[in-house]
């Protein structure tokens, strides 16, 4: 069976915290800011954690990422 590889696209988008959780940036932050409220833009600046339901799948993609 071939070696399992780290999914490079996922590895660039996710960082592991000291406690082992996965930190990610939020979606909807690339353009069209004129249509978004100030409050929405402020909340989008903060990083978020990968949800509990997605953890197993994302951890498989990041098999060897520290």
UniProtKB/Swiss-Prot annotation:
Keyword Ribosomal protein belongs to the record: yes
Composition skew (Basic residues), residue ranges: 1-26
Signal sequence residues: none
SUPFAM superfamilies reported for this sequence: L35p-like
Record-level GO cellular component terms: cytosolic large ribosomal subunit
UniProt keyword Ribonucleoprotein, yes or no: yes
Ranges for region Disordered: 1-49
InterPro entries cross-referenced by the UniProt entry: Ribosomal_bL35 (IPR001706), Ribosomal_bL35-like (IPR021137), Ribosomal_bL35_CS (IPR018265), Ribosomal_bL35_sf (IPR037229)
Database matches in Gene3D superfamilies: 4.10.410.60
A GO term, aspect molecular function: structural constituent of ribosome
One annotated GO biological process: translation
Entry keyword set: Ribonucleoprotein, Ribosomal protein
NCBIfam families per record: rpmI_bact
UniProt family annotation: Belongs to the bacterial ribosomal protein bL35 family.
Protein name listed in UniProt: Large ribosomal subunit protein bL35
Organism for this UniProt entry: Staphylococcus carnosus (strain TM300)
GN (gene name): rpmI
């Amino acid at each position: 069976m071939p070696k399992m590889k780290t999914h490079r696209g996922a590895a660039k988008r996710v960082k592991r915290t000291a406690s082992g959780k996965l930190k990610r940036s939020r979606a909807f932050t690339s353009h069209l800011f004129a249509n978004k409220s100030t409050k929405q833009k402020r909340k989008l600046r903060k990083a978020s954690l990968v949800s509990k339901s997605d953890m197993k799948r994302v951890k498989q993609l990041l098999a060897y990422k520290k």
